[in-house]
């Protein structure tokens, strides 16, 4: 994959992000604590949600390959690992008690990776069941938010720390029903967390990507990104101190579409007006 690095943003070739014209400040205008803009994984203690497979498993392996001293590999029912540096940890991000137990068990974390997510079988938001809507809201939005809030004191207590939120290109493309809606909400939360945690030295990174070659995307015949390539791109960005990762052309194009007329993004709306 060809990648070009711009100020505080990593995109695949052809992207056109515009650097922010102002430095991030906290909720009350406090300037960020002076820390290095580099965030090496060497020696880090990492917690990965949704670590049992797919992207989560790759984050576990790649963090260790970059020198992480320990990785908490979390899931509702965590799998076993053949590496003493990997600590299986039960965590249900939709359960407040489970979140608090994880904070207590993993109070040495320096990098939090919000990777766990849910999807739906059909895209129509009006046809989703109540259970599908609640599951996506709790897993894709409230869970990562509550986990970030719970771990914020742990991360701010460290000399250097980072948080990585895995969004989706569907954050900017509303054809995925409740999945798109919850990923858009998480994107907004990540932006808020970044501003509030920057003054405390916590670097918050948002990741956008289209389909990735995992079981969650098995239904799609569209091109898919290899999890290895995705995680490599993300961790390169984290170590470079970047704020946002647009991991594929789909993400680049959809973000650019935010400033386009809505009929250009959704041609069916233009047809309905004719």
Where are these regions (language model features)?
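Conserved mid-core segment of classical short-chain dehydrogenase/reductases
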Residues: 119-134
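A short, exposed helix-loop element centered on a Lys and neighboring polar residues
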Residues: 148-149, 191
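Active-site loop of short-chain dehydrogenase/reductase
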Residues: 108-109, 155-167, 199-203
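N-terminal Rossmann NAD(P)H-binding glycine-rich loop of SDR-like oxidoreductase domains
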Residues: 52, 56, 60
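C-terminal helical subdomain
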Residues: 206, 214, 218-260
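Rossmann-fold cofactor-recognition segment
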Residues: 83-95
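Active-site helix of classical SDR
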Residues: 148, 182-183
């Amino acid at each position: 994959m060809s990648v070009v690095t711009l100020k505080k943003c990593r995109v695949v070739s052809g992207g056109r992000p515009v650097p922010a014209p102002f430095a991030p400040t906290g909720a009350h205008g406090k300037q960020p604590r002076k820390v290095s803009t580099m965030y090496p994984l060497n020696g880090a203690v990492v917690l990965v949600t949704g670590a049992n497979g797919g992207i989560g498993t790759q984050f576990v392996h790649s963090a260790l390959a970059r020198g992480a001293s320990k990785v908490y590999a979390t899931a509702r029912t965590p799998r076993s690992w053949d590496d003493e540096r990997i600590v299986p940890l039960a965590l249900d991000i939709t359960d407040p008690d489970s979140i608090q137990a994880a904070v207590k068990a993993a109070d040495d974390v320096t990098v939090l990776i919000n990777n766990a997510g849910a999807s739906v079988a059909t895209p129509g938001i009006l046809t989703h069941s109540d259970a599908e809507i609640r599951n996506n809201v709790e897993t894709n939005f409230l869970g990562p938010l509550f986990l970030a809030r719970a771990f914020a004191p742990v991360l701010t207590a460290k000399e250097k720390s980072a948080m990585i939120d895995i969004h989706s290109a569907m954050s900017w493309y509303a054809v995925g029903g409740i999945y798109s809606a919850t990923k858009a909400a998480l994107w907004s939360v990540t932006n808020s967390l970044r501003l509030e945690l920057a003054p405390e030295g916590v670097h918050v990174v948002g990741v956008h990507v289209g389909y990735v070659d995992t079981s969650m995307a098995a239904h799609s015949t569209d091109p898919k990104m290899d999890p290895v390539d995705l995680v490599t791109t993300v961790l390169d960005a984290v170590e470079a101190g970047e704020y946002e990762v647009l991991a594929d052309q789909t993400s680049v194009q959809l973000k650019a579409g935010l400033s386009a007329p809505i009929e250009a993004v959704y041609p069916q709306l233009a047809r309905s007006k004719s």
